[in-house]
Every structure is written in structure tokens, then in C-alpha cells.
């Protein structure tokens, strides 16, 4: 995002960081660039992050009350083909049949194509399309043994780990 120097100056003064203002030689706007971190996956050259997916799920009234959490999983199969999987954890006592799961996947993919032009291009040319796998609350990759202090939204894993986790 872009922060005008005047606004940045007010914020720094409020935070008691006059020392930083004294270092400024020019009063141009500042561009904050957020690079790729470990909180994204690569899909055929496009970067897909959990915030995009979370917004899409939360905006869909049909699924926002049913989905407890998710993971973006990038994995390789035995032939070294890259896959993108949306692993979905359901709320307790919620169910989702195959047709509903496909509907959720279709919604996620369509919305990602709308908001992420790199994804749109990647999806069009990708030999393997995104997948979805639905898990009951606290089961599979969302069970107690996979719990961490901080939610683990992204997995970049190899074939051996994907097989061990039962992803294919």
C-alpha cells in the first residue's frame, strides 16, 4: 500500500519516533511492498494466499457457517506433477456431500480468477486443476496431532508426505 509522507509523519510523531523523521531527506510517499512469504503456495506460477481463500469462503453464505478452517496444500504426486488442494475442515456436526464440495471448489476457483489475474492465467494453462478434500471437524490433517499454537494455513509438501497424510 502507499502511505503519503504527511500521514506517515503524523503516525511516527504519535509513536514517539521523531528520530526516524530526522533521517528523512525527501518527503515522497512511501510504498510498502509485501512480498511472498511462507504463507502462500505456488500454482503454475501464480501465488495463492490464505487471505484470498478465507475472504471467498466467508463471503459465501452457503459455506461460511459450515467451514471451520482450511489449508492450502501444494504437493507433488509420484510423477512429480504439482497439485493445488484446498483442504476444508467442517464445523462440528456439519456435513458436506461431494456435490456441495465441488460447488465450494468451483466458487473458490471462480473468485480467485476474478481477483488474481495470475491465477486466472495459471488455471487456464495448468495441466492439473485445483482439488478439494473435505474433512470432518478434528479429523485427518486437522486432528490433534496436526494442531499448532498458530493456525497452519499453508503446506508445501512432497509426494511422500502427501501420501502419508492420505491426500491421494
Mark where each language-model region is.
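AMP-binding adenylation
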Residues: 1-168
Amino acid at each position: 500500500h502507499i502511505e503519503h509522507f504527511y500521514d506517515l509523519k503524523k503516525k511516527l510523531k504519535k509513536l514517539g519516533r521523531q528520530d526516524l523523521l530526522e533521517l528523512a531527506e525527501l518527503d515522497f510517499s512511501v510504498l510498502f511492498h509485501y512480498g511472498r512469504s511462507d504463507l502462500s503456495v505456488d500454482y503454475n506460477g501464480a501465488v495463492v494466499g490464505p487471505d484470498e481463500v478465507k475472504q471467498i469462503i466467508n463471503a459465501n453464505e452457503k459455506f461460511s457457517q459450515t467451514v471451520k478452517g482450511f489449508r492450502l496444500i501444494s504437493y507433488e504426486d509420484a510423477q512429480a506433477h504439482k497439485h493445488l488442494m484446498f483442504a476444508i475442515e467442517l464445523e462440528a456436526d456439519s456435513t458436506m456431500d461431494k456435490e456441495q464440495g465441488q460447488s465450494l471448489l468451483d466458487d473458490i476457483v471462480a473468485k480467485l480468477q476474478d481477483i488474481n489475474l495470475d491465477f486466472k492465467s495459471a488455471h487456464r494453462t495448468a495441466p492439473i486443476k485445483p482439488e478439494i478434500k473435505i474433512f470432518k471437524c478434528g479429523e485427518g490433517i486437522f486432528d490433534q496431532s496436526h494442531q499448532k499454537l498458530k493456525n497452519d494455513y499453508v503446506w508445501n509438501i512432497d509426494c511422500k508426505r502427501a501420501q502419508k497424510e492420505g491426500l491421494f
